[in-house]
């Protein structure tokens, strides 16, 4: 009734290997004619187009098992239900990847605009932030560890960040906090909310500067002295906690280095 073709002929037409065709058969996607005398399998154009259809579904992101199942559906409605669900998954992936691209461009802009100790007034990004340590010591409760572990799952959208509390600066307390942050524009991807340990810092007018730090030197708010001098000269007052964004880190030899962008709330 139908012309038949060998597995080699079919593989050549499709640009795939004979083993791939055998794999589709094992998954129940095609049912070639089996010659019991020779033990050879022969394929028709139905098999050709069934494989093409299967590869289309695989191209939409369905797994091989999901592809096998959809090809066994008996109604268009059943097929559409599967495709509707896959459409939602593709849409979610597109949204995620668009934000990933935006994050990459944001990061590159921070790197390209890095000017050490150059002072300007800018609006800070809104960020969510959680502490990892006080100064250089990890001292977290079990609940803090759990929330921190969850926060670290948001890579690559998160960044390391130092925090200098306003009250510490006013009382000349050199302790600071280090932690992890995420910009508000990306927090919605993960439905991040404020908690006892996750704190939100809204966008606000800040004195902006950049500086580099290194592991051989203890970090203190004293690195911000150029900013404090600028504030005195321009009648600006500190109006909140100071936080930094780590633009990048590197380790050329035995020492660690950070590049910080610093946001100093002023009024």
What are these regions (language model features)?
Residues 42-44, 76, 250:
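Short Asp/Glu-rich motifs
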Residues 22, 35, 68, 163, ...:
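Short loop/turn and capping residues at structural boundaries
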Residues 81, 98, 102-267:
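A solvent-exposed interaction/effector surface
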Residues 35-36, 55, 60, 67-121:
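Short, charged amphipathic alpha-helical surface segments
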Residues 1-60, 234-239:
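Basic helix-turn-helix/winged-helix DNA-binding cores
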Residues 11-20, 25-32, 72-89, 147-162:
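An N-terminal domain-start capping segment
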Residues 33-37, 58-68, 256-267:
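Histidine- and aromatic-rich ligand-binding microenvironments
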